[in-house]
Amino acid sequence: MSEIIRIGMDTSKTVFQVHGVDAVEQPVLRKKLRRRAVLAFFAKLAPTKVGLEACGGAHYWARELKALGHEAVLLPPQYVKPYVRRGKNDAADAEAICEAMSRPRMRFVPAKTAEQTAAQMLIGVRDQLIRRRTQLTNAIRGYAAEFGLTAAKGLSHIEPLLARIENDQALPELAKELFATLRQDYARLKLQIREIHAKLAAWHRNNELSQRLAEVPTVGPIGACLLAIKVTDPHAFRSGRDFAAWIGLTPKDHSTAGKQRLGAITRAGDEALRQALVVGATAVVQQVRKGRGHPSAWLVDIVKRKPPKLAAVALANKNARVLWKLMVSGERYNPHRERGRFVPPTGSVASRSPRQGRFAPPSAVALSQP
């Protein structure tokens, strides 16, 4: 058999398919493997380049292949699909991976270490617990409304609602027992979320990068942890604009015939990162519209000319570029390096009215909601 220079491997729970080519791009290896035989098979091969789709379990297999001396690379599945010639089966997928990884401009996903995977799991478990709590509180409100018991918005009103339910003598005994079960579930979820936040705070204190990123306005500890955990290799991006585009904060491009047509942001990439940056930027824009803080002249100008949501996205895009620079340079955030800083006068900053499409007076801006 000729020397194998590249192998594409399609993974699954139990059955793996490998496709290898030689120096003249001729297929020399087509083999189906059971899960338990994968590592033994690659242990017998000479070190080569192995490509996998960046799906479930891919980071584990990349670590194991690197331990055996191979060069393991992960490819985004959406970049592999165009190379599938015909049909949908494991052999065709493995061949497509092998072909896609040979492209000189192919983008790869950095493989995560076990520690990075555990840290990302911390974020995932937190999100899952918060979703379960939201689902449970909605159920409690819905069931309580059927008995004429309602509560105002917000988590702070859930426990008083449960206390009213417990003391309501008009409720059937069966309903009280079921509400007691829901109350126990809510208390358990509340405790688990508190413990997760404590773990996240401890991770933030022990991570130098996360602490540096938290110094940037609009980021905060949660956003800094998300960035430090999910951006494993900031050097993979050529510029801050590429990083902002990866998060999905750049506009869609529909240009043709020399005419530039830009639309809404792409919303590509990691939704949690984009949400953290946009929410933080929205809070800053609200403060600027009320005449508070010490914004830069650039931000004041954006708030005057653009609707609040658009200004928030523009600020999030700018902050993403600043964060990328901090990650690749190792510097600390220095707010005085920003040019054109401006302290607005007392009172609200006039901004464009979203409905009327013109500049609104300060009083109207202060009363309007972004």
Predicted regions and their residues:
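A detector of single, family-specific signature residues
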Residues: 1-370
